[in-house]
């Protein structure tokens, strides 16, 4: 076992210890198929939670998307995301001739699964912000890859935006039934439907808390 493998097991254990990192599969089983998991985004811990909630045998082929400027700023963060999580780095500062999806396209061509957050940025408002177009373009280019919606619950209370120390809170990740890009479906309709598939997985308790004054 390599040091990176050992660190991965340790981090999965810590994530489950602090948050529970319980994965609930509704509409799809945890199978070794190429997938794009797309979820709501509220914390830097989001992709760690999804990764920890996956069965061990799926983690090696499932790569999170990570902001290059943040996750390569520092030797440990860079090593962690590169060696342990095998992250796909994306640049938030882009040139006009740069395709922001190219790293994701390359990973999918190599047979990897991905964890992405179509909002593009974190939100602490409960419901996801409008989805950006990346998911639509990936669905167009890779119709054979399953698109799995996921709802991460309670993680904003573990590590809210701006905080650096996690608080022990039970979290869940609910994986829903796969969606597909319909024949002739336009970008706007697909993104609205994809967002609705994520929101539909929100537990009733969380909906009531969000609606409370």
Could you tell me what each predicted segment is?
Residues 48-49, 72-75, 99, 156-162:
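A short, acidic/glycine-rich surface segment
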Residues 94-98, 128:
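A conditional alpha-helix N-cap/helix-loop micro-motif detector
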Residues 100-102, 106, 171-199, 205:
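A charged, well-structured terminal subsegment
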């Amino acid at each position: 076992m390599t040091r990176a493998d050992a660190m991965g097991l340790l981090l999965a254990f810590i994530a489950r210890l602090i948050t529970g990192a319980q994965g609930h599969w509704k509409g799809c089983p945890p199978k070794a198929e190429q997938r794009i998991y797309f979820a709501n985004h509220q914390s830097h811990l989001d992709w760690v939670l999804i990764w920890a909630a996956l069965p061990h045998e799926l983690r090696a082929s499932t790569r999170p998307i990570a902001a290059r400027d943040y996750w390569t700023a520092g030797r440990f963060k860079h090593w962690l995301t590169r060696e342990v999580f095998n992250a796909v780095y994306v640049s938030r500062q882009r040139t006009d001739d740069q395709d922001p999806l190219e790293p994701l396209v390359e990973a999918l061509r190599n047979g990897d699964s991905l964890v992405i957050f179509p909002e593009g940025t974190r939100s602490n408002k409960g419901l996801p912000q409008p989805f950006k177009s990346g998911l639509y373009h990936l669905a167009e280019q890779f119709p054979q890859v399953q698109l799995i919606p996921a709802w991460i619950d309670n993680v904003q209370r573990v590590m809210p935006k701006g905080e650096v120390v996690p608080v022990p809170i039970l979290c869940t990740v609910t994986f829903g039934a796969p969606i597909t890009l319909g024949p002739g479906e336009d970008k706007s309709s697909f993104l609205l439907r994809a967002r609705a598939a994520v929101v539909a997985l929100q537990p009733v308790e969380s909906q009531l808390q969000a609606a409370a004054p």
